[in-house]
């Protein structure tokens, strides 16, 4: 919306135009990772860093405080703090990943505020984005969750167990054509929900995106 407002303001000047993305690139991609799995720190983040990329890692404080002892091992606050120092975004996925469909609006608010407080207390940053558990949202929830934030995740494409080279290539082609901002949603890498059949598919995709960094922000 801000982009469109600025574009409209400058539209009368033929010598000036507003680039939609940094470097006037054709499209943009954000890679986001849900639920704070331990391998996001040991596998996903290092693979992104190899290519000069950074990701958004949505965490639930309830899971994080269980760490390696959880049924599905999770990142610790120490690991998340180090990732944040390296430039990754650590942000909120609610406190305990409860389905907002079964909660009152006050309970949803409590889940959000408790997790924001935990992230700030343990990492020293205030989350400026938000990811909805189970991707469930209503206009009221979006309005509430958006207060004090630059964005919440309202659209995404699943990157995981159903990913193929063909699907990755089509996604890139569609983003380029539409000049769109794509948001990837990944859960498991080697284990957990929607884990890859072969993680190498993802790394090869990242290599391709790296080779196109003059076109993709």
Can you say where each PLM-predicted feature lies in the sequence?
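C-terminal domain-boundary segment and adjacent tail
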Residues: 3-23, 50, 55, 59-61, ...
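Short, glycine/acidic-enriched loop or turn micro-motifs at the edges of active sites
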Residues: 37-38, 96
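Active-site-proximal N-terminal segment of extracellular/periplasmic enzymes that hydrolyze or transfer
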Residues: 24, 39-52
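Short glycine/proline-enriched loop/turn "hinge" motifs that connect secondary-structure elements
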Residues: 174-178
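Short amphipathic alpha-helical segments and helix-helix/interface helices
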Residues: 42-45, 77-81, 141-145, 172, ...
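Aromatic/hydrophobic pocket-lining residues that form the small-molecule binding cavity
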Residues: 41, 76, 108, 112, ...
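Metal-dependent polysaccharide deacetylase catalytic core of the NodB/CE4 family, i.e.
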Residues: 27-29, 49-142, 147-151, 156, ...
